[in-house]
Amino acid sequence: MLTSSLAFDIAQFFPLLNHHLLALILGKAGFDPQVVKFFLNYLVNRKTKYFWNNFSSSTVNINMEVGQGSAFSPILLALYLALVLHILEKHLKNLDLKISILSFVNDSLLIIQSKSFQTSNTCLFSSYNIAFNLHSKFGLVVKHSKTEVFHFSRSQETFSPSSLNLSSLGSPILYPKDTCRSLRFIFDRKLLFCQYIDFYANKAISIVKYMKILSNLIRGLNPQQKQLLYRSYALPIALYGFQIWYYNKAPLSYSLKILGKLQRRAALWIVGAFKTVLTFGIEAITSLIPIHLHLQKLSRRSQLRVYSLSTNHILQSLIENNSNTFTHLYPISLSSLTRH
């Protein structure tokens, strides 16, 4: 089976929310009429003036709809978008399009699994057409310029998926890329995450290089301060989102090699040692945990966070049932992926 995805972005998501439709959604959701009335007039018919020294501008209308920095924005957009996704799922189900939908604020993703890229492209085209028209009816604008298609495959054969022609919808022809960037994550077609690890490791290495400038100050930095600076600033960047590639039976030779080079470079800088010093020795002197043990520690700590969630949280059903809270686990349980 081949997995394909199509990512699209909603332009000016917060300012485009329709107040009247939002009020109908709140009323349908069972909110108090006074609350519905409040949001019906929320940030509507507002005016402002600009003052600069002795200059004052004329009155300007600023109907902001829902402000992006408002504390209400996350809640309102979730209620607004939930209806859009609910209707979209119904349309796709009626057309027998086996598409999965993921959404994070204004970034959405359509995912399909099929036996050929041609079938995937056909389903993605139909699904995107439905999603685009549905968002337009809700007053939301989809950015065609940010729409991307990506195909996943671990086949060792020549990988040449066909392009997706969306020109009839006003979007350009989409050509699959070698990597896909989403929410600061970098995905490759085989999900090996080599480019992802390289990107953040190089970022951390650059930080270690720039840290040397701090050592040239009048007072400089002692080894203890250098070690603290590396652990609190450079290392968290290198290990950003490590849970996505660090799991049971995952190939770790490449990632441990790259991260090991990073830590060795930092350790040499901390004590000012020669490059010929052994890695284990320099890590012991600088009190740095070997990178593979540090990853194990962070992984176990992240797994413990699930116990701080409420018993009816959706993530509880994805993890191994130790407390017998759920009699039936999710069909694709993550218990086999969270042991290391």
Regions found by a protein language model. Name each.
Residues S171-W245:
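Basic, alpha-helical interaction scaffolds
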Residues N54, V141-D178:
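Short, conserved micro-motifs composed of acidic
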Residues L76-K115:
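Active-site palm subdomain of RNA-directed nucleic acid polymerases
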Residues S4-A7, F51-L76, I111-S114, I218-N222:
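Short, conserved non-catalytic motifs in the polymerase core
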Residues L262, K275, G281-H340:
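Extended C-terminal regions of large enzymes
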Residues D9, L26, F39, Y50, ...:
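Mobile genetic element proteins and their domesticated derivatives, centered on retroelements
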Residues A11-F14, I62-L92, A131:
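Conserved pre-motif C helix in the palm subdomain of viral-like polymerases
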Residues M1-L24:
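Conserved catalytic palm subdomain of right-hand nucleotidyl-transferase polymerases, strongest
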